[in-house]
Amino acid sequence: MIVNGKNYSEEIKKLLTQNSKNIDERFFGNNSFSLVSLCNGNIQGFSAYYKISNSLCEIFLYISPELIDQPEEIRLLEKLISVEKGNGFETLKVCVQNLSEHEKYVCKRKGFREETSSDTKNDLYKHI
């Protein structure tokens, strides 16, 4: 997967094979949300969850290493994805806060959400 001219295939493979203590296991396996709808059904191998903090909705993407580059379908994702490193864990992150209003609207229609003031600490991690 190429984002902003950089190939993230190796990072993605490391992410998928890494055993991280930082992520709640309920967000893996059959409980993972498929992002196929985000890509109009043309891409397989996405799963995600989001973390809400300080008015920022961070969407963490887990991408199958077998995923073939399909730039047209992931054009929106390419603008949003960044690599976050910390506490020995590396992940791909989408920051909804950094989107234009139009892109936020598109993302919301496809299942993303931003924090509301009613979100509580117990809701820090929510499954999409």
PLM region spans:
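C-terminal "cap" of GNAT-fold acetyltransferases
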Residues: K110-G111, S117-I128
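Short amphipathic alpha-helix that is part of the acyltransferase structural core
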Residues: M1-E25
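Conserved active-site alpha-helix within GNAT-family acetyltransferase domains
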Residues: N98-T116
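Conserved acetyl-CoA binding element of GNAT-fold acetyltransferases
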Residues: S55-E66
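Conserved beta-strand in the GNAT
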Residues: V36, N42-Y50, C57-E58
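Conserved acetyl-CoA-binding loop-helix of GNAT-fold acetyltransferases
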Residues: D69-E84, R109
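Conserved GNAT acetyl-CoA-binding A-motif
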Residues: E84-Q97
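Short, low-complexity Ser/Thr-rich regulatory SLiMs
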Residues: Y50-K51, T116
